[in-house]
Structures are given as structure tokens and as C-alpha cells.
UniProtKB/Swiss-Prot annotation:
Keywords: Acyltransferase, Heme biosynthesis, Pyridoxal phosphate, Transferase. Gene3D superfamilies: Aspartate Aminotransferase, domain 1, Type I PLP-dependent aspartate aminotransferase-like (Major domain). Pathway: Porphyrin-containing compound metabolism; protoporphyrin-IX biosynthesis; 5-aminolevulinate from glycine: step 1/1. This is 5-aminolevulinate synthase. The active site is at K244. The gene is hemA.
Length: 414
């Protein structure tokens, strides 16, 4: 083993010893049988997929993508500046701007890139800018702010009082921006959006909201929590993804013409990469259009979320209580959490990926349950029964787990 192999091997061994080694599951998704998949030649039920509404297999979306594939081919042919600025992606951006009631939109290869390169670019455009960021913001937000090398203040999670204290400390005439998420993916809590908007206005700050876990799911047309609260027009930059509720891939920002154009001309994550293929852009556009017109998926989704939480209450299964569609079960032990996940998959045919550090803080390791409109009452009951049996086998005390979940909840909303 070479000198460098030893370094890498030690790094891997350390992660394994901490119980947070990640193994990919080889899955064969079944487009005609969502939310089922095949794993190790067995049919399983997926309970952790971010294809929130099953739009990846929706007939309109698949047929549109097939038509685009035959018409345009597989790839986009280049960057947006050199050959890759196709009609399909322009239509997608127009649809996104309309969704969020903004003047313009810009599409990126992923939600991560959209956050990372946009935030870093804002600091290039405004070198004196100050970032104010929620302490539990996504890694992509942290990466963008960090790489910007701009001055930053981190406010306590969801704590608008602390945010105001920090805003007060900076000259009101200095460029500043508050960056936050509408719904936090690991805990499921919503941000106090209107309070943040009011503070930003009071202290002359821009607002940047990450709506990746809410677009398509909330609001009359699927415009996210900002649309639900009727405040999209009061937020300067709305960022979202095409890879979750819309069932495709890609990320985007929406804002006014000048801001979007400035990012288009500045962001390396936009300029120096191949654009989304027309087949993806077309599929995303049709997915957005369908969810603008149809509320059926959202209604059914919320019904299943409620049924799942009610089932957990009946079975005395501890979970982190919130108002969103994300249902975390905090176990607090990386080894037991991984074992519970593997037992669900191998013994019960239920796939729930365990979430360990660094995705969540140590001591809050969890299973994160993601309901979809396609999950049935039987699937909910099977999951509940399996969890009770696995908790007993792993000596996970329900009372202790309940206390841990409540402790985490109180810490998050304190």
C-alpha cells in the first residue's frame, strides 16, 4: 500500500469506526409501479425518495421528454454561451419566472450549484456585501458564502430576534443579504418568512430564500411557502430545484431582470458548465405546468402525510413534530440508526436511508421518512409495525426516543 493509499485508508477507517460509513443501495426504480423499486432481486417500498409527488413517472412528463429526446437528441451541445442555449431551456426559465411572479429566471445544473455560485457571485458584484445566514442552512449555501470570502454573520436557527441583533450591528447603507430556507430538510421546520422579510426591509437588506423542499408542494400553483403566504413579491431572490417535487434535475434562481442578468454574466457555476439537455428542460417545464393546474397531487400528498403521522401516534413511534411533509425519527445513535435502516430494507422490504453526521449533528442521527401521494394505508401500517419491532429488537426505548425528539424540537424552535 502506497503512502497516499494509507492516508485514504485511515480516513475511511475513521469514518467506519464512527458508524457513519455510507454505502450506496443498488436500486431499480419502477416507473410503472411507484413508489416500488427492486433491490437485491426483491421488490421494496421506498420511503425516503425526494421525488415527492412521483412526477418523474407522470405520463405528461415522460411523454414530453420522449418527444424532446427524439426531436433534439440527448445532450445540449455546450454551455449556455456556446451552443447550449436551446429553446427548451428558455421556455423553462420563462415558466419558472411566471411560477414565482418574477421578471426573470436562470437555470443551473443543480440546486447546489444554484446556491453556491449565485451567493459567491453576489460578493463579486457587491464586494462590500455582508451575509446573514441561518445556522442550519444547507451545505450549498454555506459553500457559496464561504467561497465568497465576504463578511458573514450566522444567526441562531429560526431566531429572528438574534437576526435583528446582528443586522443592527452593520451600517444600514452597506449591502447585505439574509439567506434562509423555507423548510429545513432534516427537521422539517418552516422559517418565519414574513418576520424575516420585515427585518430585511427595516435594515435595507436583500432576501434570498431556498425553496427546494417546498416548490411544487405548497401554494396554489406550487410556488412554495412564499406563494402560500402570498409574499413571493416581497422576496428578492427565490431559489429552487427541479429535482424534487418536479421529478427531474437542475436548480434555478428567480428575481428581477437586472439581478438575474448580473448573475448570468458573473457566476462561474453557470458560465463554465454544459447546460441542461433539452430533454430535461422540456420534462421540467411540463411538470411545472401540470402542478400549476392540478392541485390533486398536493391534496393527496398532505392526506398521506397526516395519515402517516397519525399512525406513528397510534403506535407510539417517536418523531420530530413539525408542520411539514418531512417526518424525522431521531434515534441519536449512529450504529443503531444504521442497523434500523438495514433491517427495514433486508427484513421488511422497506427502504429508509439513515441520516448521520455530517448531514445532521452528532447525537441526532435519524431516519427521515418521506411520504408521497402513492403510499397506501397498508404501506403506512407495514412501516409502523416494522419500526416498533425493530426498535424492540435494537433496545431503542420508545420513551427515551420520544424525549430526545422533543428535546431536539425545543432546541430548534427556542
Amino acid at each position: 500500500m502506497s503512502y497516499y493509499d494509507i492516508i485514504f485508508s485511515k480516513h475511511i477507517d475513521k469514518i467506519k469506526s464512527e458508524g457513519r460509513y455510507r454505502e450506496f443501495k443498488a436500486l431499480k426504480r419502477q416507473a410503472d409501479n411507484f413508489p416500488f423499486a427492486e433491490h437485491a432481486n426483491k421488490q421494496i417500498v421506498m420511503w425516503c425518495i425526494n421525488d415527492y409527488l412521483g412526477m418523474s413517472k407522470h405520463a405528461k412528463v415522460m411523454h414530453a421528454s420522449i418527444d424532446a429526446l427524439l426531436k433534439y437528441g440527448v445532450g445540449s451541445g455546450g454551455t449556455r454561451n456556446i451552443g447550449g442555449n436551446n429553446i427548451a431551456i428558455l421556455e423553462l426559465e420563462k415558466e419558472l419566472a411566471n411560477l414565482h411572479k418574477k421578471q426573470a429566471a436562470l437555470v443551473f445544473t443543480s440546486g447546489f450549484v444554484a446556491n453556491d455560485t449565485t451567493l459567491a457571485s453576489l460578493a463579486k458584484i457587491m464586494p462590500d456585501i455582508v451575509f446573514f445566514s441561518d445556522e442550519l442552512n444547507h451545505a450549498s449555501i454555506i459553500a457559496g458564502i464561504t467561497s465568497s470570502r465576504a463578511e458573514k454573520y450566522i444567526y441562531r436557527h429560526l431566531d429572528v430576534k438574534h437576526l435583528e441583533e446582528l443586522l443592527q450591528s452593520v451600517d444600514i447603507n452597506r449591502p447585505k443579504i439574509v439567506v434562509f430556507e423555507s423548510a429545513y430538510s432534516m427537521d422539517g421546520f418552516f422559517s418565519p418568512i414574513k418576520d424575516i422579510i420585515n427585518l430585511a426591509k427595516k435594515y435595507n437588506a436583500l432576501t434570498f430564500i431556498d425553496e427546494v423542499h417546498t416548490v411544487g408542494l405548497y401554494g396554489k400553483q406550487g410556488g412554495g411557502i412564499a406563494e402560500l403566504l402570498n409574499c413571493s413579491d416581497q422576496i428578492d431572490i427565490i431559489q429552487g430545484t427541479l429535482a424534487k417535487a418536479y421529478g427531474t434535475i437542475g436548480g434555478y434562481i428567480t428575481s428581477n431582470h437586472n439581478l438575474v442578468d448580473a448573475i448570468r454574466l458573473t457566476a462561474p457555476g453557470f458560465i463554465f458548465t454544459t447546460s441542461l439537455p433539452p430533454v430535461i428542460s422540456t420534462a421540467a417545464t411540463h411538470s411545472i405546468r401540470h402542478l400549476k393546474e392540478s392541485n390533486e397531487e398536493r391534496i393527496k400528498h398532505q392526506e398521506v402525510v397526516t395519515k402517516l403521522k397519525n399512525s406513528f401516534e397510534r403506535f407510539n413511534i417517536p418523531y420530530l413534530k413539525n408542520e411539514s411533509h418531512i417526518v424525522p425519527i431521531i434515534i441519536g445513535d449512529p450504529i443503531k440508526t444504521a442497523k434500523a435502516s438495514n433491517m427495514l430494507l433486508n427484513e421488511y422490504g422497506i427502504y429508509v436511508q439513515h441520516i448521520n453526521f455530517p448531514t445532521v449533528p452528532r447525537g441526532t442521527e435519524r431516519l427521515r421518512i418521506i411520504p408521497t401521494p402513492a403510499h397506501t394505508d397498508k404501506m403506512i401500517n407495514d412501516l409502523s409495525v416494522a419500526l416498533v419491532q425493530i426498535f424492540a429488537e435494537l433496545d431503542i426505548e420508545l420513551s427515551s426516543a420520544k424525549e430526545l425528539n422533543e428535546e431536539v424540537r425545543l432546541n430548534l424552535i427556542a
